Each structure stands twice: as C-alpha cells, then as structure tokens.
Design a protein with these regions (language model features):
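Short alpha-helical segment that forms part of, or immediately flanks, the ligand-binding pocket
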Residues: 140, 163-168
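Acidic donor-binding loop of glycosyltransferase active sites
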Residues: 144-158
C-alpha cells in the first residue's frame, strides 16, 4: 500500500519528524512526501544526508484557491479573525487591538470565527461578534463581505490557509 504524507507545518516542530532518524524513517516508509512550500521541504531536509535532498519522493504543491473578481461594493466595514482562539495564532494580539480599533472607529464591526478549549481568552465589545466554530461554507460567505482579514500567528507558519481563503 502506498503511503503519502502531507506537511503543512514545520516538520522540525512536529512529533514523528523532529529527529533526523524519524525523518529518514518517513522517507523509507512513504511513497511520497508532499510539502506546501519550499520552506517546509527545506526544514524537513535539515541535517539529512545529501542523498535525500534530491529524492523524487519529495514534492512541493503550493497552496492555491479558485479566485473570482472581488466585488468591492459588497464589502462592509468588517474586520475578521478566523482560527484557533489562542496565543499561538495571535488571538490575544487581535483581541486587545480590536477593542482599541472599534473604540476609535464607530462605523466598523469585527467578527471572530473559531474556538479553543484550552485557552480562555475573552474580549468583549458591543460591535465584536464572536461566532465560535463555523463550517467552511459559512466562513467563505463572511469573507466575501469582510474588508480586512487579520492573521497574526506568532509561530513560523509555512502558509496559513486563512490568508489564502480570505484573499480569494
């Protein structure tokens, strides 16, 4: 049976691929290892023998999305944050900043989509609407009327899908 592995995070920070020996084992066991960026692939190859660098098993498929012409007339004065509501994703930065922004800009609103059971970061404002988890279709509908999408991850995110989806 073929085994295909897809990395969309930093391989050196993930259990099962932190050590050189673990990554060599993955190369031996997998038919293909797909990365979402050259950066992710290069991180995977860190300290590996030169023989692995040119392996045909390793390929990069960059993130993509169907794009449509954006109708700016349908955009509203909405600032949106989508993702895990934790410090790693920068929700604490967004939360404290959005309160100031909303206080200074009375005609703007903010929407937060996501959840996080481990961290309880709470921000309250009468024009801050925290929706919790939403399915992908609902998120895309909200992005279509959003003027500003905020992605403020703290960690080395190879390529966050949220930024791609909000731009398409």
């Amino acid at each position: 049976a073929k085994k295909i592995l897809y990395f969309h995070n930093d391989p050196l920070s993930m259990n099962g691929s932190k050590l050189v020996s673990e990554r060599e084992e993955l190369l031996n066991k997998c038919s293909k290892i797909i990365f979402n960026s050259e950066w992710s692939k290069n991180r995977f190859l860190t300290k590996l023998n030169e023989i692995f660098v040119k392996s045909p098993k390793l390929i990069v498929i960059k993130q993509s999305a169907d794009t449509q012409k954006v109708d700016l007339k349908k955009k509203k004065k909405i600032i949106t944050f989508v993702g895990k509501l934790n410090r790693a994703k920068g929700y604490d930065i967004f939360g404290s900043s959005i309160i100031e922004i909303l206080n200074d800009n009375k005609d703007w609103n903010a929407i937060v989509i996501g959840d996080e059971e481990r961290e309880k970061l709470q921000f309250n404002h009468n024009r801050l609407n925290i929706l919790g988890f939403k399915n992908h279709e609902d998120v895309i509908k909200i992005f279509k009327k959003t003027s500003i999408s905020v992605v403020c991850s703290r960690w080395e995110e190879p390529f966050g899908r949220t930024s791609l989806e909000s731009a398409s």
